[in-house]
């Protein structure tokens, strides 16, 4: 971790490009959706070629363990990227992190064209995974800081929608290129990501800096100007849900609350454990729903049920298309519906479908020689096309249910469930836990398919059911709950006067009087100055 910090601290400055800043929610959301599109491109870029003859001959038919490592290298890098985001959070601005990350993405994307062995492919995918892991926290944190509360859900839904569009576009590109019997086919596919990468790099200069981050660095005048511009633009389009223009004193409240603190050397305040466990449980629900396995290894499932050639390739594209189309629906209701209800309406049906798929595989599956030399595929139900059709239909149904429920809701649900003082740090922990679960399942999936066969789906279905049951019993409904209600529900820091950093009292100026109001404790009072840009001090 110390070595990683030393590298991060020496990052160069970004080139200055004069582009007019935008403060409109729709334009900011449009730019952020490019991040979702970029993240989506990486999902099928390797999976589509895993059963390709040219790919397997070039890389000498990877073993199930090697296949798992290749597929799992991206989420493994994602875990590292989450830690990098936490290290960079305090020192570097949100926009700088976006720009430095996308530059590295573009460089590594070009290097993909020069890959000649499994090790090189593994390293490139891991580095790109680090960028995606960084962005997975960064884009959610930035949206939470800049987008008004009533529009955050739809913003995340648009980002998720563009992620599914990226998956679909890349899948069809890979299908088209796989028809070309040459190693240049997968090389070109892995370089496509530089196009949206360059677009996002240029568009990032139009994004306003997070005024939360500016407050934490004492740049109060700049922070106030950005917050006022964002509020004015939003109020012009949404007068009923007007956002107040905050004073410097109100903005300074974020400093003592510590909402943006990602320093894990500092102890989390009392009451943080339960919401963190619930947030991590939601991430487990997303992973055990089987969506990454179905989307990542759909070509495996097609071959197991007996599909070949172009029929296999185009059938494997159906779940990506379903995922994209049905991801449009949450945008229409995510800001107005029960978080808990939508989560349950996704979790329970998916668990039943997974168990049904596993039961069909167990009953009708038969051992066979490795299909097309792929040592992960040693069983088949090719002699039962009717059963194979049902299995594929159930897989498509799982993808559809997931797209309408678990694709967006858990991210909003987790963010709303976390108390204000640990929202960013808690969300980072939950996302990191999600990447860890993604890596373990993606890495083990080829081995599980080889050894456990259909039982793999029964295990996923059973765990999804148990997690959904825990959501039903223990999870609160956060729709309509204020920050104070959330803190009260989890008994978060109910002892008056203790803040995130273990400080026992903070003195804040009272805007309604000449004096000040003091948050006191048994150990006395604490005055904490913020250095302002104009060399003045504000005591909070």
UniProtKB/Swiss-Prot annotation:
Keywords noted in UniProt: Glycoprotein, Membrane, Repeat, Transmembrane, Transmembrane helix, Transport
Membrane-spanning intervals of the chain: 30-50, 68-88, 102-122, 127-147, 159-179, 188-208, 276-296, 314-334, 342-362, 386-406, 429-449, 456-476
A GO molecular-function annotation: transmembrane transporter activity
InterPro entries for this protein: MFS_dom (IPR020846), MFS_sugar_transport-like (IPR005828), MFS_Sugar_Transporters (IPR050360), MFS_trans_sf (IPR036259), Sugar_transporter_CS (IPR005829)
Taxonomic lineage: Eukaryota, Fungi, Dikarya, Ascomycota, Saccharomycotina
Subcellular location as annotated: Membrane
Protein family: Belongs to the major facilitator superfamily. Sugar transporter (TC 2.A.1.1) family.
Main location group: membrane
Membrane topology: Multi-pass membrane protein
Compositionally biased spans, kind Polar residues: 509-524
Entry's Gene Ontology cellular component terms: fungal-type vacuole; membrane; prospore membrane
Residues carrying sugar: 52, 374
Coiled-coil regions, chain positions: none
Regions of this protein lying in the Extracellular compartment: 51-67, 123-126, 180-187, 297-313, 363-385, 450-455
Residue numbers spanned by region Disordered: 499-540
Naturally occurring in which organism (per UniProt): Saccharomyces cerevisiae (strain ATCC 204508 / S288c)
Pfam families: Sugar_tr
UniProt-recorded name of the protein: Probable metabolite transport protein YFL040W
SUPFAM superfamilies in alphabetical order: MFS general substrate transporter
GO biological process terms held by the UniProt record: myo-inositol import across plasma membrane; transmembrane transport
Positions in the Cytoplasmic compartment: 1-29, 89-101, 148-158, 209-275, 335-341, 407-428, 477-540
